[in-house]
Amino acid sequence: MAKTALKNKAAAKPKFKVRAYTRCQVCGRPHSVYRKFGLCRICLREKAHRGELPGVTKSSW
């Protein structure tokens, strides 16, 4: 889990646009965040398995 200070820092509007970065809305993880959902890969997988994300299905090929 991310520290509260880092979550707040990411939420604040930066002075320069290039300093902005995405964090997971659930756990605050800064890496591998899917912009479409606002979730990291781990939280995305958990929510998809529980059926909390409509339209997301497990792929099979």
From Swiss-Prot:
- Its domain of life reads Bacteria
Keyword annotations: Metal-binding, Ribonucleoprotein, Ribosomal protein, RNA-binding, rRNA-binding, Zinc
Which free-text remark accompanies the cofactor?
Binds 1 zinc ion per subunit.
Database matches in Pfam families: Ribosomal_S14
Q: Which GO terms describe its biological process?
A: translation
Whether DNA damage counts among this entry's keywords is: no
Q: Where does Zn(2+) bind?
A: C24, C27, C40, C43
> What cofactor requirement does the entry state?
Zn(2+)
Q: What Gene Ontology terms describe where this protein resides (cellular component)?
A: cytoplasm; small ribosomal subunit
Which GO MF term does the entry hold, naming one? rRNA binding
Q: Which SUPFAM superfamilies match?
A: Glucocorticoid receptor-like (DNA-binding domain)
Quaternary context: Part of the 30S ribosomal subunit. Contacts proteins S3 and S10.
Q: What family does this chain come from, according to its entry?
A: Belongs to the universal ribosomal protein uS14 family. Zinc-binding uS14 subfamily.
Tell me, what does this protein do in biology?
Binds 16S rRNA, required for the assembly of 30S particles and may also be responsible for determining the conformation of the 16S rRNA at the A site.
Mind telling me what this protein is named? Small ribosomal subunit protein uS14
